[in-house]
């Protein structure tokens, strides 16, 4: 499968799931992005078009972590969950952004659940 086909396939999946998934201030959308070397996660309020919280493997508190392997993704998910709980957010809607729920995406979700987020 060529790179263009992969990108267009992911975009179609993303568009289809975005039609069904929306975040609010009470139950924001946990949106992830996985690049080859990093992982990013945001809590987004779609009704107000604002980002409530953002954590990535490039954050200042993650300087000692190298790459974006499964363990790094689990740590990023745990940090996101802890920061969300501190802001009073307990439930979220998970948006995998067209990526398969496997490997690093699953590790980030598991880390967020370990910290107490419900989805």
Swiss-Prot record:
GO cellular component, one term: cytosolic large ribosomal subunit
GO molecular function: 5S rRNA binding; structural constituent of ribosome
GO biological process: translation
Annotated keywords: Ribonucleoprotein, Ribosomal protein, RNA-binding, rRNA-binding
Gene3D superfamilies: 3.30.420.100
Alphabetical list of Pfam families matching this protein: Ribosomal_L18p
Superkingdom of source: Bacteria
Primary role: This is one of the proteins that bind and probably mediate the attachment of the 5S RNA into the large ribosomal subunit, where it forms part of the central protuberance.
Family affiliation: Belongs to the universal ribosomal protein uL18 family.
UniProt subunit comment: Part of the 50S ribosomal subunit; part of the 5S rRNA/L5/L18/L25 subcomplex. Contacts the 5S and 23S rRNAs.
Name of the protein in its database record: Large ribosomal subunit protein uL18
Gene for this chain: rplR
């Amino acid at each position: 499968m060529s790179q263009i086909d992969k990108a267009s396939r992911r975009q179609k999946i993303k568009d289809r799931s975005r039609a069904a998934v929306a975040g609010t201030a009470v139950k924001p959308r946990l949106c992830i992005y996985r690049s080859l070397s990093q992982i990013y996660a945001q809590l987004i309020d779609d009704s107000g078009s604002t980002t409530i919280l953002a954590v990535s493997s490039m954050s200042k508190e993650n300087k000692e972590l190298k790459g974006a392997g499964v363990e790094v993704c689990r740590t990023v998910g745990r940090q996101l969950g802890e920061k969300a709980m501190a802001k009073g957010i307990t439930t979220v809607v998970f948006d995998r952004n067209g990526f398969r729920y496997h490997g690093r995406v699953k590790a980030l979700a598991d880390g967020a659940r370990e910290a107490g987020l419900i989805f």
